[in-house]
Structures are given as C-alpha cells and as structure tokens.
C-alpha cells in the first residue's frame, strides 16, 4: 500500500474527538511529553511515572465515558492528584522551574475542574 492510500485510510478512520475533557487530556499529554524529554537520566523513573500517569488519565476518561462508572471518574481524580505529586517532586529535585510547575498545574487544574463538573452533571441526572 502506498503512502497516499495509508493517509486516506488514516483520515477516514481518525476518531472525531467530541468529548472535551478527552481533548484537554490529549493536549496535556502532548505538553507533558514535549517538556519532560529533557529530564536527567537519573530521574528517568520519575519522568516515566509522569508520562504513564498522564496516559492513565486519558484511559480512565474513555472508560468513564463508555461504562458510566463512578469509580472510573474517581480514578481520574486520583490520577490527577498523583500526577500533581510527581510534578511537585520534580520541582523539589530542581528538575522543573517554578514557571513550568505553574504551567503544568494549570493544565491539571483544567482537567480536574472538567472532571468534577462531569461528576455534578451525572449526579443531577
């Protein structure tokens, strides 16, 4: 299969992201991956935890949307809190600047607000 056909197939089957919280999580993942690639090798485990947890947030968003389970929504909040903890640890180890930590925190705050609004919406049904 040539490249043009593959591109056409990809465009045809690319998912249309209608869930705003998932869009926000994907944006956060891209930001985190871009900005953690310069972590020192001795903090590789911390970097991997940060990236892994950000993917877990997106996975749990999709699970909560599909299965409509309150536990999946709670797991999103837990993952956001854990990710915030990992980022604070990176700041304490002087891997992240204060400016970067604030930037990461703003992304997480947006996700947290969206998740909690989702909780309230589901409870009001």
Q: Which residues fall in each region the model found?
A:
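Amphipathic alpha-helical assembly/interaction segments
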Residues: 1-125
């Amino acid at each position: 299969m040539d490249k043009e056909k593959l591109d056409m197939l990809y465009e045809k089957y690319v998912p249309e992201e209608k869930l705003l919280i998932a869009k926000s999580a994907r944006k956060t993942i891209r930001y985190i991956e871009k900005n953690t690639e310069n972590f020192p090798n001795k903090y590789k485990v911390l970097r991997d935890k940060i990236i892994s947890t950000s993917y877990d947030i997106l996975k749990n968003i999709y699970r909560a949307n599909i299965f409509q389970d309150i536990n999946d929504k709670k797991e999103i909040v837990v993952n956001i809190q854990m990710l915030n903890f990992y980022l604070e640890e990176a700041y304490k180890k002087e891997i992240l600047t204060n400016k970067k930590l604030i930037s990461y925190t703003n992304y997480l705050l947006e996700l947290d607000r969206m998740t909690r609004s989702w909780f309230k919406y589901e409870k009001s049904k």
